[in-house]
């Protein structure tokens, strides 16, 4: 069946052409629209933050399924858009959730998402790699989706990712690819992670074994490596 032909106004034509031009330049549709879906919610996104991925939603689901009756105090390290922390706060109203990031631009986006989704996450500025600056509380759960893509892997990635999404949230040097996981493991060894507390992280699929061994080397127990929906090593859980 033929649908009714719609005639666009000059203003609408200009707007549509602008969108087409941005798409042709490789800009992600989520940045053009200014929003992206995640865990049944809508999140504001712009080039200050990564676009949420379905694999990360699996990490959120893992935490929720493990903590249905507890009232955990959670810290999201490197929150970006706030998609992890806000989703946990929304689906675990009994939890106290905090989140940090080194990027002020990312924190602005995360705080806006906190308001839009009517959650009560506390956000603050912090550099995960700065082990000298204390964190504000002790937590039951540390969660993170830190930068983990090696610089050498960039050539195999789509241009809409490498040209538009923030490199500081994506890439790590090949010669120190696990730097953020090492920092998280060291943070967890302090009073920041309570005895018996858990760490959940998203990881590089090419470094699953190495990342698991890193947490084991720090004395964490029951280090569990889990695959994502695509069959790739993607998440690790362990406890103190």
Features from the language model and the residues they span:
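Mobile active-site "lid"/loop adjacent to the S-adenosyl-L-methionine
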Residues: 148-180
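Conserved beta-strand segments of alpha/beta enzyme cores
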Residues: 42, 96, 120-122, 221-224
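Active-site beta-alpha loop architecture of Rossmann-like, nucleotide-cofactor-dependent enzymes
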Residues: 30, 149-152, 206
């Amino acid at each position: 069946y033929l649908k009714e032909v719609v005639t666009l106004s000059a203003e609408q034509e200009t707007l549509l052409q602008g969108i087409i031009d941005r798409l042709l330049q490789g800009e992600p549709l989520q940045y053009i629209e200014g929003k992206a879906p995640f865990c049944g919610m809508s999140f504001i996104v712009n080039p200050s933050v990564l676009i949420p991925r379905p694999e990360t939603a699996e990490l959120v689901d893992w935490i929720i399924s493990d903590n249905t009756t507890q009232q955990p105090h959670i810290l999201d390290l490197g929150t970006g858009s706030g998609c992890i922390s806000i989703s946990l706060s929304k689906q675990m109203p009994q939890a106290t959730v905090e989140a940090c990031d080194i990027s002020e631009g990312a924190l602005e986006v995360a705080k806006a998402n906190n308001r839009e989704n009517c959650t009560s996450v506390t956000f603050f500025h912090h550099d995960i790699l700065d082990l000298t600056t204390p964190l504000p509380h002790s937590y039951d759960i540390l969660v993170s989706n830190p930068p983990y893509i090696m610089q050498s892997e960039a050539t195999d990635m789509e241009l809409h990712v490498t040209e538009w999404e923030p490199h500081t949230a994506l890439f790590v040097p090949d010669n120190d690819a696990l730097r953020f996981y090492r920092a998280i493991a060291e943070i967890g060894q302090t009073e920041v992670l309570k005895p018996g507390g858990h760490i959940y992280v998203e990881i590089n699929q090419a470094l699953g074994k190495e990342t698991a061994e890193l947490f084991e080397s720090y004395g964490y127990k029951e280090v569990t490596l889990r695959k994502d929906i695509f069959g790739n090593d993607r998440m690790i859980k362990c406890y103190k």
